[in-house]
Regions:
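Acidic/glycine-rich beta-solenoid
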Residues: 1-203
Length: 203
């Protein structure tokens, strides 16, 4: 139970569990004289398969929406779908490589809203590319001081239709703690430097 700030109105919430101790349903009163109900159906491996939200209010029609989740054989998320008013749309599609790393993500079933991911031999993320955003991460390569511990030595990015490449070079202390982030533009991160630089003064 919770009391609405500045009033005597109270909101009550009830939780229902399945035989495995998972929250199967929550029922909460709302300030519109109705209830908000969330019901979850799980997979055999305890991942949510469907999550249904039902909203009622006094004198208003009931609204129900449902999220549906699909997984592959390794329990990695493949698809998220949303249903409202009987209309189902795809929110996201996911694809993985043979090592189980996220390879691509498409939003709303559109190829124009697709992001692809690249990795190095150590499975460290090295790039994200799409029509709206591109980012590259460098460890022992690039324009910063080479790092072999997993620290990012530099990164660059470009958003939307911008022609300007922006980036940061990073430096660390002897304990691999971030000390400086030096801003720059162009692929070499050496133009308009220090416009948005940050420095860690102490640990």
């Amino acid at each position: 139970m919770a009391t609405v700030l500045g009033s005597s109105n109270k909101i009550y919430t009830a939780y229902y569990y399945d035989i495995k101790g998972r929250v199967a349903k929550t029922v909460q009163s709302n300030l519109l004289g109705g209830y908000d109900v969330t019901a979850t159906i799980y997979t055999f491996t305890d991942k949510p398969a469907t999550v249904t939200h039902t909203h009622t209010a006094s004198g208003k029609p009931t609204r129900t929406e449902m999220y549906t989740y699909s997984y592959n054989h390794a329990d990695r998320l493949l698809k998220v779908e949303h249903t409202l008013g009987g209309t189902k749309i795809t929110l996201a599609d996911y694809a993985y490589d043979n090592l189980g790393r996220l390879q691509s993500k498409s939003l709303h079933g559109s190829a124009t809203n697709k992001l692809t991911y690249a990795y190095n031999v150590r499975s460290w993320l090295t790039g994200i590319s799409g029509s709206k955003f591109t980012q590259n991460l460098y460890y022992n390569t690039g324009n910063g001081t080479a790092c072999y511990t997993g620290n990012i030595s530099s990164m660059t990015w470009k958003a939307g239709n911008e022609s300007t490449i922006r980036g940061y070079k990073f430096t660390y202390d002897g304990l691999s703690r971030l000390m400086n982030a030096t801003y720059g533009e162009t692929a070499g991160i050496n133009t308009n430097t220090n416009r948005f630089s940050e420095n860690v003064t102490a640990y």
